[in-house]
From Swiss-Prot:
Belongs to the neurexin family. Residues 1446-1461 have a biased composition (Acidic residues). The gene is nrxn3a. It comes from Danio rerio (Zebrafish). Keywords: Angiogenesis, Calcium, Cell adhesion, Disulfide bond, EGF-like domain, Membrane, Metal-binding, Repeat, Signal, Transmembrane, Transmembrane helix. This is Neurexin-3a. GO terms for biological process: angiogenesis; cell adhesion. Neuronal cell surface protein that may be involved in cell recognition and cell adhesion. The keyword Repeat applies.
Length: 1697
C-alpha cells in the first residue's frame, strides 16, 4: 500500500461522505492548494461558497485556459473581495464594497452569464461585462482553491503572477457548482477539519460547539443557560430544565429541525381536533433568507388570528383577538433582515393589568405583546381591550399557505423563500414543535410541495431591468378564477409604461347601440403620468383604479400587492391600500394566454387591447426595474425567464446610473433631450429626423392635390388617448393634413389647414351610439399664416376628455363635453379624404409636403416606405419634389375660360403657379356688385393685384427682383384677412397693405381665368392695365380653399387650352420651345435622344420615367413578411447574352437581402444576383466558371434613403455604380484570349477538339455568355434572404418587369407581402415579350434568344411580330464556347450564328434596327459642310459598308438602307465625369459612361443650323485590336475570315492621339457622327430621330451573321427591307457620295499632316469579341506624347463621315 497517497484518499473519502459538512482550513503556508474538478463556466453557471478570514490580501480561487487569454481569479485585496477575469483577452475587474477580513462568515457567489460575470457577497451583487469577439470563456484547467501548485510551469498559466500571490488563510466551506458539490481531486497543506466552524467557539457561558448540517450547534446541557448560543437563563425549575435542555441538545446534535422553502412549499398543522384557546402564548423560530417579503407563520381566521411575516426586509407581526388588529414592525438599524443570515424571532403575549387613563382609574386586563429579533430589537404593545383570548380551530401555516393574499391581516401575498428552523408554538397547555412535527411527518401535519429538511441556498429573485420600451417578457397563463394575488416591486424615473397585461377569450357582447363588439376579460397594471393604475374587466365593464396619490416615478423601490376575492379586492402600494370593486355581478375573471410583463410584443394581431388601457394604445412600454414577482404567492424567477426567452433590451440587474444622460448632448439636429431610466430620450418632433438620436432623416411625401397616403388598419381601432405629430409645408391656406376615418361612423380626429391656420376637429359620434350627452364635433385652432412654404410642426395630445393642439409654439387646449371618449377609426388618411360617407363637408385636398407623421408612437410615412406595414395605400411621391398640380396650358392670348363666382366675401386666400414667356396678360378677373371687383394680371413681367371693395380701386404690385416671364414656375399667394389686410406674395417676396373702409368683397358673375370675353377689355376698371389674355401655363389654382379642375369645371372655354405644360424653353433661347438636347433636357442621368422636330429622353438606366426622366418609375413596396415577383420567359424566348444592363432604384434599412436574381434554365447554373450584404450592395454573377462579385464597399446603402444602382456586364467584365458615386469595376485576371480567337478561326480536326478545349481550360479562360435566361425573381424570399423596402423603375436588358407586373403580365406572378405604389403605369410602358421594341441606348448583345436546343434551324417568330424576323439560333446554350461539341460556322465564333429571314414588303415604311453598331475610329477626321437635307442624305450614303469584308460585302445588302438619322452626343443632367480615373482594359465598355453599353458614340447638340464642331477629346487614343504603322497614322486591319460573322464599317477619321481617355469630359461642341438608328414608324409621318448618348468609353460592335445587318437580332428585333427599287437608288447615291467623301478625306489628310500615331498595348485586353477583331476601337494605358493637349480648330459647318 502506498502510504503517501493515503492522506489524500482519506481526504477524498471524508469529502465524499460528509459533503456539505466539510470545511477546508487553509493555514496560509506557502505551497498550499486544493484542486477541484474543472468548473464549466464557459457560458452560464454559478459557484458559491462560504468563507471567513482575517487577512487583507490572499488568493481564494483561480482557473484559466492553459496560458492563452481567458482566466478567472478571486482574491482578497485590501480586505475586500476582488474578482478579475478575462474573455478572449478582454479583461476587467470587480471589487466588493464590503470588507471581508473581519473573521466573520461571508457568503460568496460567482455567476457566469456569457460575457457578464456577477460577484455576489452576502446578498449584494456587482457585475462586470466585457465586449470581446468571442462570446464565451474557454476553460482548460481545474479549479484551485487557496493557492496553486508551485510546480506548474509558468507557460501554461494565463496569469503567471498567480504563483506569487499570498495563499489564503481561513476556512472555506459549502463550495458548490450549481447547487452540487464538486469533486475534490487533490490538495496539499490543507486541513479537512469538520470542526473548523467551531474553531472560534460561538457558544457562550461554557457551551460546547458542534457542527450539524454545516452549522454550529451549541450544547448548553452543562450550563445554566439555554438558547441558540447558551445566552438565555434557564427556567428556575431545579433539574428539570437541565434535563430538558440536555435531551434537546442531544436531539439537535443528532438532527436539527430545519427546512428549506422555495416559495411553493409550506407546512399546515390541523387544529380542528385540538383548538387553541389561550390568553398567553409564545412563538419562537429562526429564519434565513434573501427574500424581502414572505409569510412565515399564520394561524386563525376572520377576526381572531396571528400573522408573522417578512415585509420589505423587516419582520411584521399582526395580532387580532376580535376587537382590532395590533401591528408591529421590527426593522434593523442598518440594512435588512433578508441578508441570508440566521435571525431569531420571539413573540410573547401575556395577560397583564393595565391602568387605563380616562376610565376612572379602573384596572382592566390587556394582552402585552412583545416581539424581539436576535434578542436585541424589541417592540412592545397592547392589544385592544375586551378581547384577550386567542382562539383558533383552523390551521397553523408555516412558510406559506395555499392563498397567502387571502389570509386575514396578511400584509404580503407571497410565501416564504429561505430556511426556517425550530418553529415552536407554546402556551400554558400545549407545545407544538412545528418544524419537528413536519420532519417526522406527524399525521396532523400536512406538507405541501417538495420540502427539503436541511438548509439549502435558495436562489435569489434577482431584479431585471427593461432598458427599452420595446422590451418585454411573457409569463405563463394566470390561472385565476374567483381569487388571486400578484405582488412585485418596481423602480423607475419614467412617467409612462405598461407593466402587466393579460386578457381572456374574445366574447361577443352587445353595447348600448345593440351592436356586437368583441370584448375580453382583462387585467392590467400601468404607469401613466407618474401614477399607478389598476385596470380590471370581468365581463361587465372596465374599472380603472388609481392606486397612488403621489408620483411614483422618483427612482425609489415601490412594493405593489394586489389581492382579489371575487369582484372585490385591494391594491397596495407601499402599504397604502386602495379597495376596488369590479362592475357587474360576475365574480369570475376568465383569462387565457400569456401574461406580458414590461410591454407588449410587436406582433399584436392576436391581442385585443382595451381602449381604456392607454399605455397600450400609445405604445408606451415600461422602462425600469422589476423584482420579486409573486403570482398567487408563488415566486416567478423573471431573470431566468428573460434569459430563456432571450428577450432583447433586458438586463439581469438593477443599477441607477450616476449623472444625467443628457449631459453629453446625445440628441442631434436640435432634438429635445429628456432624462429616462438609465437612458436619454430624444424627442425628434419638429426636427425632420428620427431614430434614437434624431440622426435619420424622416421621409417626405409630396402631394399635388390628387395624391394621398392611406393607412388601413388591420382591424377596427378604438382609442381614448392619442398622440399625433407631423410636419408640413404648403403654400395653400387650405388642405387636409391628417384624419382618422371610420367606415361605420362619423368618428374622426382631423387636422387640416383652414384659412392658413391649423384646425383640429374631434368628432366622437355620440349620437350614433345613443349617448346621453352629445355636443357634436369639438374644434380648436392654432397657428397663423402657415401657408408660407416653411416647415411647421403640429402636435395633438388627447387623454380622454382633455385635448391639446400645438402648432410650433402656439398652444390651444380644450375639454370635451359629454361622457363618451372613445374614438373609432379604420383608416389614417393624409392629403385626400377618401372615406366620405359620414362627412358633411369634405376638406380640401392638400398640396405641399408632409413629414414625420407619428400616430401613437408609429411613424407611418417611414413604416409605409420601408415595407414595415402591409396596410398602406399611397400615390403621393416620396422626396422633396417640386409640386406642379394640375397644370393647364393657354396656347394663345385669346384663350381663356370661366368658372363659377369666386366666394371671397369676408376673407380670401388665393394661390396659383404660373410659367410664361409673355410679359403681359390677364390671369384672373371677377366683377361684382357696384364697383366691387378683383383682378390679377401680369404687367411687364410683374404681378399686379387690383381690387375694389367699394372704396375705390387699389393695386398692389409684386416686388420681385426680376421680371417673371422667364419660363420658370412662380408661386403667387394673395390673402385678405378679417382685418382687411391685403397681402400679395410672389415666390418669397411679400407686400401687404391695410385698406380702411369696406371689408366685404361682393362678387357676381363668372370668374375669368387667363383672359376675358369679347368686348370686355373696353369696360375694365381703372388701374387694370392688361388688354390681352395670358399665354403660358397655370397650375395649382386654389380659389379660397376650392381646387377647381380648370378644364372640367369650366363654364365656358375659348381658344387653345390643353391639359399639362409640356412645352419648355431653354436657358439660351426663350423665344420658342426647345427642340434640341440641352444639358438639363433629361433629369436623373437620363440620355437625350435628338430627333428632327424635338428630342426624347431615354430613362431606362435611371429608375425614373416620364418625358424628362423626373417621374418615379413603377414602385413596389416589399413588406416584412417577405414577397416575391417572378417573371418567366416563355420556353422559346429565353435569351442568352454577352452583355447585360441592370438598373433599379431602392430604399431599405435591411442589412441583408436579395433584390433581384436572374437565373438560367435548370441545369446550367448561370445566374446574376443583386443583393445587400452587411448593408453594402453588390452584384454576384456566374457565367460558367466561378462566382464574380462587384460590390460598393465604401458606403452602406441601408440608410433608408433612395439610391439608384446601375450594373453592366460585358463578358467577364463588369461595373457597378450607386447614384453618382465612384464606379466599381471588375476585370477578370488571366491571359488574353487572342490565342483562343485565332485558334477558333482555324480548321481544327475533330480528334483534336478535346485536347484544345482542355488546353484552353488550363489557360484559365473565362466564359462570357449568360446562357438561356429563364427567370427573374425580385424580392429574395425564395432564397430565404427576403428584401424589405422599396424597389422602383427596374430595368433589365430592355425588360421593365415592375411595369409588366403592374399591368398584369401573364408571365409574372406576385406572392407574399408586395404592394404597388400609386397607379398602374400606362400601357406600352412595359414589355410583354423578351426584348423591348425601342432600344435606342439599350443595346444587348444577344447570342441565343429563341431556343435552347443546339440544332441549327430557323425558328418561327413570336406571335407579336407581324413583320420580317431575324432569329438567332440556340447554339451551344449549355456551354458558352465549346469548340468540340459545337463547331461554329466558317468564320464564326462558337456558334454565334443567326439566320436572317428577309421578307420584302413594299407597303410598309422602312424601319431600321433599334440598336446601332459602333463604328471604329481611324486616326484622321474628315469634315464636310452639313445641312438638314445633307444630313438625311448622308445617313443613307455616308456609311457605305457595315462589314469588313471589302466592297464585295457592300453590294445589294445595303440597297435598302433607310438610316437617315444622326447619332449625336448629349448627356443627361446629373451625370458624373471624372478624367482622373485610371484607364481600363475592357475594350467593350464606353469611354466615359462606363455603365452604358450602347452601340453609339457621343457628340453634342446643334446650334442653329446644326453646326458641328471638332471634338475636344482627352489625351489618350482609341486603338483597334490589330494595327500596322503607316507613317504617323494607324488604320484598322480587317480580317476577311471574319466577314461573315462581324459587322463594322469604314470608320470616320479622327485626329490621332485624341481618343480613349478614361473619363472623357463632355463638351457642348463635339462633332456629329451619322450612324444608323431607329425610326418611329407610323403611316402618316416618318421621323428620323437624332440619338444622343453619353461619351462612351468604348462600345462593343454588334455581331450579325450576314453582311449589311446592323445589329444582332433578338427575339423581337425586326429588320425591315423596302423594295429593290429603293435599294438601287440608295446604292447609286451611296457610291456617288463615297467618291466625294474620298476626295474630301484626302484633302483633310493633307491639311492635317502633323498628327501623331497610335501605340498598341495588349497586356490587359481580355475580351476579344468579333467587334475587336474587325476594327473596333481599343483603349490604351498610355497617353499620347505628342498631341495630349492639342485642340482641334473647327469653324466651318462640318460633320463626320
Amino acid at each position: 500500500m502506498n502510504f503517501f497517497r493515503f492522506p489524500v484518499q482519506l481526504q477524498l473519502l471524508i469529502s465524499t461522505v460528509l459533503g456539505p459538512c466539510l470545511g477546508l482550513e487553509f493555514t496560509g503556508l506557502q505551497g498550499q492548494w486544493a484542486r477541484y474538478l474543472r468548473w464549466d463556466a464557459s457560458t452560464r453557471s454559478d459557484l458559491s461558497f462560504q468563507f471567513k478570514t482575517d487577512v487583507s490580501t490572499a488568493l481564494i480561487l483561480y482557473f484559466d485556459d492553459g496560458g492563452f487569454c481567458d482566466f478567472l481569479q478571486l482574491m482578497v485585496v485590501e480586505g475586500k473581495l476582488q474578482l478579475q477575469f478575462s474573455i478572449d483577452c478582454a479583461e476587467t475587474t470587480v471589487v466588493s464594497d464590503k470588507r471581508v477580513n473581519d473573521s466573520s462568515w461571508h457568503s460568496a457567489t460567482l455567476s457566469r452569464y456569457n460575457l457578464r460575470t456577477v460577484l455576489g457577497l452576502d446578498g449584494v451583487s456587482k457585475w462586470a461585462e466585457v465586449r470581446p469577439l468571442r462570446q464565451y470563456m474557454k476553460i482548460v484547467s481545474d479549479l484551485f482553491l487557496g493557492g496553486v501548485p508551485q510546480d506548474i510551469r509558468i507557460s501554461v498559466l494565463t496569469l503567471p503572477t498567480v504563483k506569487d500571490l499570498p495563499p489564503f488563510k481561513g476556512i472555506i466551506r459549502e463550495l458548490k457548482y450549481n447547487s452540487k458539490e464538486p469533486i475534490l481531486l487533490s490538495s496539499q497543506r490543507v486541513r479537512m477539519d469538520i470542526e473548523g466552524i467551531c474553531m472560534e467557539n460561538p457558544c457562550e457561558n461554557g457551551g460546547t460547539c458542534s457542527v450539524v448540517d454545516g452549522e454550529p450547534l451549541c450544547d448548553c446541557s452543562k450550563t445554566e443557560y439555554v438558547g441558540r448560543f447558551c445566552n438565555e437563563e434557564a427556567n428556575n425549575i431545579p433539574g428539570f430544565a437541565h434535563m430538558m435542555m440536555a435531551d434537546q441538545a442531544k436531539g439537535k446534535a443528532r438532527e436539527e429541525n430545519v427546512a428549506t422553502f422555495r416559495g411553493s412549499e409550506f407546512f399546515c398543522y390541523d387544529l380542528s381536533q385540538n383548538p387553541i384557546q389561550s390568553s398567553s402564548d409564545e412563538i419562537t423560530l429562526s429564519f434565513k433568507t434573501w427574500q424581502r417579503n414572505g409569510l412565515i407563520l399564520h394561524t386563525g381566521k376572520s377576526a381572531d388570528y396571528v400573522n408573522l411575516a417578512l415585509k420589505d426586509g423587516a419582520v411584521s407581526l399582526v395580532i387580532n383577538l376580535g376587537s382590532g388588529a395590533f401591528e408591529a414592525i421590527v426593522e434593523p438599524v442598518n440594512g435588512k433582515f433578508n441578508d441570508n443570515s440566521w435571525h431569531d424571532v420571539k413573540v410573547t403575549r401575556n395577560l397583564r393589568q393595565h391602568s387605563g387613563i380616562g376610565h376612572a382609574m379602573v384596572n382592566k386586563l390587556h394582552c402585552l405583546v412583545t416581539i424581539s429579533v436576535d434578542g436585541i430589537l424589541t417592540t412592545t404593545g397592547y392589544t385592544q381591550e375586551d378581547y384577550t383570548m386567542l382562539g383558533s380551530d383552523d390551521f397553523f401555516y408555516v412558510g406559506g399557505s395555499p392563498s397567502t393574499a387571502d389570509l386575514p391581516g396578511s400584509p404580503v401575498s407571497n410565501n416564504f423563500m429561505g430556511c426556517l428552523k425550530e418553529v415552536v408554538y407554546k402556551n400554558n397547555d400545549i407545545r407544538l414543535e412545528l418544524s419537528r412535527l413536519a420532519r417526522i411527518v406527524d399525521p396532523k401535519m400536512k406538507i405541501q410541495g417538495d420540502v427539503v429538511f436541511k438548509c439549502e441556498n435558495v436562489a435569489t429573485l434577482d431584479p431585471i431591468s427593461f432598458e427599452t420600451p420595446e422590451a418585454y417578457i411573457s409569463l405563463p397563463k394566470w390561472n385565476t378564477k374567483r381569487m388571486g394575488s400578484i405582488s412585485f416591486d418596481f423602480r423607475t424615473t419614467e412617467p409612462n409604461g405598461l407593466i402587466l397585461f393579460t386578457h381572456g377569450k374574445p366574447q361577443e357582447r352587445k353595447d348600448a347601440r345593440s351592436q356586437k363588439n368583441t370584448k375580453v376579460d382583462f387585467f392590467a397594471v400601468e404607469l401613466l403620468d407618474g401614477s399607478l393604475y389598476l385596470l380590471l374587466d370581468m365581463g361587465s365593464g372596465t374599472i380603472k383604479v388609481k392606486a397612488t396619490q403621489n408620483k411614483v416615478n422618483d427612482g425609489a423601490w415601490y412594493h405593489v400587492d394586489i389581492q382579489r376575492d371575487g369582484r372585490s379586492g385591494t391594491i397596495s402600494v407601499n402599504s397604502r391600500r386602495t379597495p376596488f370593486t369590479a362592475s357587474g355581478e360576475n365574480e369570475i375573471l376568465d383569462l387565457e394566454g400569456d401574461m406580458y410583463l414590461g410591454g407588449l410584443p410587436d406582433s399584436r394581431g392576436s391581442l385585443i387591447l382595451p381602449t381604456e388601457l392607454w399605455t397600450a394604445m400609445l405604445n408606451y412600454g415600461y422602462v425600469g426595474c422589476i423584482r420579486d414577482l409573486f403570482i398567487d404567492g408563488r415566486s416567478k424567477d423573471i431573470r431566468q425567464i428573460a434569459e430563456a426567452q432571450n428577450g432583447a433590451g433586458i438586463k439581469p440587474s438593477c443599477n441607477k446610473m450616476s449623472g444625467k444622460q443628457c449631459d453629453s448632448y446625445p440628441c442631434k439636429n436640435k432634438g429635445l433631450c429628456k432624462e429616462g431610466w438609465n437612458r436619454f430620450i430624444c424627442d425628434c418632433t419638429g426636427t425632420g429626423y428620427w431614430s434614437r438620436t434624431c440622426e435619420r432623416e424622416a421621409s417626405i411625401l409630396s402631394y399635388d392635390g390628387s395624391m394621398y397616403m392611406k393607412v388601413v388598419m388591420p382591424t377596427v381601432m378604438h382609442t381614448e388617448a392619442e398622440d399625433v405629430s407631423l410636419r408640413f409645408m404648403s403654400q395653400r391656406a387650405y388642405g387636409l393634413l391628417m384624419a382618422t376615418t371610420s367606415r361605420d361612423s362619423a368618428d374622426t380626429l382631423r387636422l387640416e389647414l383652414d384659412g392658413s391656420r391649423v384646425k383640429l376637429t374631434v368628432n366622437l359620434d355620440c349620437i350614433r351610439i345613443n349617448c346621453n350627452s352629445s355636443k357634436g364635433p369639438e374644434t380648436l385652432y392654432a397657428g397663423q399664416k402657415l401657408n408660407d412654404n416653411e416647415w411647421h410642426t403640429v402636435r395633438v395630445i388627447r387623454r380622454g376628455k382633455s385635448y391639446k393642439l400645438t402648432v410650433d409654439d402656439d398652444v390651444a387646449e380644450g375639454q370635451m363635453v359629454g361622457d363618451h371618449t372613445r374614438l373609432e377609426f379604420h383608416n389614417i388618411e393624409t392629403g385626400v379624404m377618401t372615406e366620405r360617407r359620414f362627412v358633411s363637408m369634405i376638406p380640401s385636398s392638400f398640396i405641399g409636403h408632409l413629414q414625420s407623421l407619428k400616430f401613437n408612437g408609429l411613424l407611418y410615412i417611414d413604416l409605409c416606405k420601408n415595407g414595415d406595414i402591409d396596410f398602406c395605400e399611397l400615390n403621393a411621391r416620396f422626396g422633396m419634389r417640386s409640386i406642379i398640380a394640375d397644370p393647364v396650358t393657354f396656347k394663345s392670348k385669346n384663350s381663356y375660360l370661366s368658372l363659377a363666382t369666386l366666394q371671397a366675401y369676408t376673407s380670401m386666400h388665393l394661390f396659383f403657379q404660373f410659367k410664361t414667356t409673355s410679359a403681359d396678360g390677364f390671369i384672373l378677373f371677377n366683377s361684382g356688385d357696384g364697383s366691387d371687383f378683383i383682378a390679377v394680371e401680369l404687367v411687364k413681367g410683374y404681378i399686379h393685384y387690383v381690387f375694389n371693395l367699394g372704396n375705390g380701386p387699389n393695386v398692389i404690385k409684386g416686388n420681385s427682383e426680376r421680371a417673371l416671364h422667364d419660363n420658370q414656375w412662380h408661386n403667387v399667394v394673395i390673402t385678405r384677412d378679417n382685418s382687411n389686410v391685403h397681402t400679395l406674395k410672389v415666390d418669397a417676396k411679400a407686400v401687404s397693405q391695410v385698406v380702411n373702409g369696406a371689408k366685404n368683397l361682393d362678387l357676381k358673375g363668372d370668374l375669368f381665368i387667363a383672359g376675358l370675353g369679347p368686348n370686355m377689355y373696353n369696360n375694365l376698371p381703372k388701374l387694370v392695365a392688361s388688354r390681352e389674355g395670358f399665354k403660358g401655363c397655370l397650375a395649382s389654382v386654389d380659389l379660397n380653399g376650392r381646387l377647381p379642375d380648370l378644364i372640367n369645371d369650366a363654364l365656358f372655354r375659348s381658344g387653345q387650352i390643353e391639359r399639362g405644360c409640356e412645352v419648355g424653353f431653354t436657358k439660351a433661347d426663350l423665344k420658342g420651345p426647345s427642340t434640341t438636347c440641352q444639358e438639363d433636357s433629361c433629369a436623373n442621368m437620363g440620355i437625350c435622344i435628338q430627333q428632327w422636330e424635338n428630342y426624347t429622353c431615354d430613362c431606362s438606366m435611371t429608375s425614373y420615367t416620364g418625358t424628362h426622366c423626373n417621374d418615379p418609375g413603377t414602385t413596389y413596396i416589399f413588406g416584412k413578411g417577405g414577397g416575391l415577383i417572378s417573371f418567366n420567359w416563355p420556353a422559346n424566348e429565353r435569351p442568352s447574352t454577352r452583355t447585360d444592363r441592370l438598373t433599379v432604384g431602392f430604399s431599405t434599412s435591411l442589412k441583408d437581402g436579395i433584390l433581384i436574381r436572374i437565373d438560367s434554365a435548370p441545369g446550367l447554373g448561370d445566374y446574376l444576383m443583386l443583393h445587400i450584404e452587411q448593408g453594402k450592395i453588390g452584384v454576384t454573377f456566374n457565367i460558367g466558371t466561378a462566382d464574380i462579385t462587384v460590390q460598393e464597399s465604401s458606403t452602406a446603402v441601408n440608410d433608408g434613403k433612395y439610391h439608384v444602382v446601375r450594373f453592366t456586364r460585358n463578358g467577364g467584365n463588369a461595373t457597378l455604380q450607386v447614384d453618382n458615386w465612384a464606379i466599381n469595376e471588375h476585370f477578370p485576371s488571366g491571359n488574353s484570349d487572342n490565342e483562343r480567337i485565332q485558334m477558333a478561326n482555324k480548321k481544327i480536326p475533330f480528334k483534336y477538339a478535346r485536347p484544345v478545349e482542355e488546353w484552353l481550360q488550363e489557360k484559365g479562360r473565362q466564359l462570357t455568355i449568360f446562357n438561356t435566361q429563364a427567370t427573374i425573381t425580385i424580392g429574395g424570399s425564395d432564397r430565404k434572404r427576403p428584401f424589405q423596402g422599396q424597389l422602383s423603375g427596374l430595368y433589365y436588358n430592355g425588360l421593365k418587369v415592375l411595369n409588366m407586373a403592374a399591368q398584369g403580365n401573364p408571365n409574372i406572378k406576385i406572392n407574399g407581402s408586395v404592394r404597388l405604389v400609386g397607379e398602374v403605369p400606362a400601357a406600352g410602358s412595359a414589355r410583354t415579350t423578351a426584348l423591348p421594341p425601342e432600344m435606342s441606348t439599350a443595346f444587348i448583345e444577344t447570342t441565343t434568344t429563341m431556343s435552347t436546343t443546339t440544332t441549327r434551324k430557323h425558328r418561327t417568330p413570336p406571335t407579336i411580330q407581324t413583320t420580317d424576323d431575324m432569329v438567332s439560333s440556340a447554339e451551344c446554350s449549355s456551354d458558352d464556347e465549346d469548340f468540340a461539341e459545337c463547331e461554329g460556322h466558317a468564320g464564326g465564333l462558337g456558334g454565334e450564328l443567326v439566320f436572317p429571314v428577309i421578307v420584302k414588303d413594299p407597303l410598309e415604311l422602312p424601319s431600321v434596327a433599334t440598336r446601332t453598331p459602333s463604328i471604329p475610329f481611324p486616326p484622321t477626321l474628315t469634315i464636310i459642310e452639313t445641312t438638314k437635307e445633307s444630313l438625311s442624305m448622308a445617313t443613307e450614303a455616308g456609311v457605305p459598308c457595315l462589314s469588313d469584308g471589302g466592297s464585295d460585302d457592300c453590294g445589294d445588302d445595303d440597297d435598302d438602307d433607310d438610316d437617315d438619322g444622326l447619332m449625336i452626343s448629349g448627356y443627361g443632367s446629373g451625370e458624373a465625369y471624372d478624367s482622373n480615373l485610371p484607364p481600363t482594359d475592357d475594350e467593350d465598355f464606353y469611354t466615359t459612361f462606363s455603365l452604358v453599353t450602347d452601340k453609339t458614340l457621343s457628340s453634342s447638340t446643334f446650334e442653329g443650323g446644326y453646326k458641328a464642331h471638332a471634338p475636344k477629346w482627352g489625351s489618350k487614343d482609341f486603338r483597334p485590336n490589330k494595327v500596322f504603322d503607316s507613317g504617323r497614322t494607324t488604320t484598322a486591319s480587317f480580317s476577311p475570315k471574319l466577314s461573315r460573322s462581324t459587322t463594322t464599317s469604314t470608320p470616320p477619321k479622327l485626329p490621332a492621339g485624341k481618343m480613349n481617355h478614361r473619363e472623357l469630359k463632355p463638351q457642348p461642341d463635339i462633332v456629329l457622327l451619322p450612324l444608323p438608328t431607329s425610326y418611329e414608324v407610323d403611316n402618316t409621318k416618318m421621323k428620323s430621330p437624332l440619338i444622343t448618348s453619353p461619351m462612351f468609353r468604348n462600345v462593343p460592335t454588334a455581331i450579325p451573321t450576314e453582311p449589311g445587318i446592323r445589329r444582332v437580332p433578338g427575339a423581337s428585333e425586326v429588320v425591315r427591307e423596302s423594295s429593290s427599287t429603293t435599294g438601287m437608288v440608295v446604292g447609286i447615291v451611296a457610291a456617288a457620295a463615297l467618291c466625294i467623301l474620298i476626295l474630301l478625306y484626302a484633302m483633310y489628310k493633307y491639311r492635317n499632316r502633323d498628327e501623331g500615331s497610335y501605340q498598341v498595348d495588349e497586356t490587359r485586353n481580355y475580351i476579344t469579341n468579333s467587334a475587336q477583331s474587325n476594327g473596333a476601337v481599343m483603349k490604351d494605358k498610355q497617353q499620347s506624347t505628342k498631341s495630349g493637349n492639342k485642340k482641334q480648330k473647327n469653324k466651318d459647318k462640318e460633320y463626320y463621315v
